[in-house]
Amino acid sequence: MRQNTIALVYDFDGTLTPKTMQEYTIIPRLKLNSNKFWADILNEANATDGEIMMIYMRQLISHAESVGIKITKDEFTFMADKIKYFSGVKDWFKNINGYIKKNHKNIKIAHYVISAGHHEILEATSIRNNLTNVFGSQYYFDKHGNATFPKIVVTDTTKTQFLFRINKGKEKFSE
């Protein structure tokens, strides 16, 4: 079967932004010392042979509770505005889409982000309207809208699953 769609897939942290999304958002919000926080995560992962992203997401909830902050979707949406992008990122999508439209009329471009970062933040970023879909780690939110545990965890190794999903057109987790 001949296809005419090119999927451009980006990581987020360090690819579209100079720092991780957490450095712009949740870490300052919780007033954490970034170096100490990440060192504690790595120490726990090494001591327990645990998955770093699971430990990180659980620790965020614990830290938030200890300072009286509820992690909610609204909180993540608010924090997304604080993200800074590399120079040219915001123009990139318009420029590449325009180039393809002008020079290759039978080709379509689809832009995706696959990130270990927070899906809820990715959904609220200023570049989201340029993206076909975003994949990231997600929390389960209880009936009060509070994050209670990691629902979906994206790691460096699970990112390949999302490439497969994009290729097969199965972008929902229930598929």
Task: Label each region the model flagged.
Residues 1-147:
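Alpha-helical substrate-recognition element adjacent to the catalytic core
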Residues 134-175:
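Conserved acidic, metal-coordinating active-site core of Asp-based
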